[in-house]
């Protein structure tokens, strides 16, 4: 096989891999993990069953990659806002706004996001792609909160790492809430209320 043929084969390989991931994401949204079979994924992707093991090693690894992509697309706009150069309070509010916008535009993705949390609870490997994304979220949130505290914008008693974990818990809880009670308090209200409470903590006398 010459260089041109190898490059052509590489392009075909890349396309098949992407189709499998996209097909898996579609199946997860519509069927959930339990009812997403290898055969269904292959049929949806227009690939043969052997392609799953060829590109990913197993269906489990393919599902993990698909869930990681689902989470990454949902959370990346917020991460971009958090890592910006604006005032930390503005970055935090912008990140919340980005999450709200994605949530509103992609409500059909809520079932797949629920599967992300279930998968993360079952597979706690630090090398697992979903764990890597959550770690990035924690680190960036913690950095912004630490900067807010250093600038005396929030109470000094607030621990950045613990608050970052709490915010992630609120994010996950909001997804669950929207899934089981779509007519209840809206995600915009929940997110805005939480941010307001955090940013108001300095004036509330909770600092030490």
What would you call each of these model-derived segments?
Residues 30-31, 85, 106, 151:
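Short coil/turn segments at alpha/beta junctions that flank glycine-rich nucleotide-binding fingerprints
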Residues 125-131, 135, 149-198, 205-208:
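Hydrophobic/aromatic-rich alpha-helical bundle segments in the mid-to-C-terminal region
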Residues 1-15, 22, 26, 204-208:
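N-terminal intrinsically disordered/low-complexity leader segments
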Residues 75-76, 80, 105-114, 124-151, ...:
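Amphipathic alpha-helical packing segments from all-alpha helical-bundle domains
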Residues 68-74:
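Short, basic, alpha-helical segments at the C-terminal edge of helix-turn-helix-like DNA-binding modules
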Residues 19, 23, 27-65:
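Helix-turn-helix
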Residues 65, 76-110, 160-167, 188:
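Hydrophobic alpha-helical connector segments
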Residues 58, 122-124:
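Short loop-to-helix capping motifs
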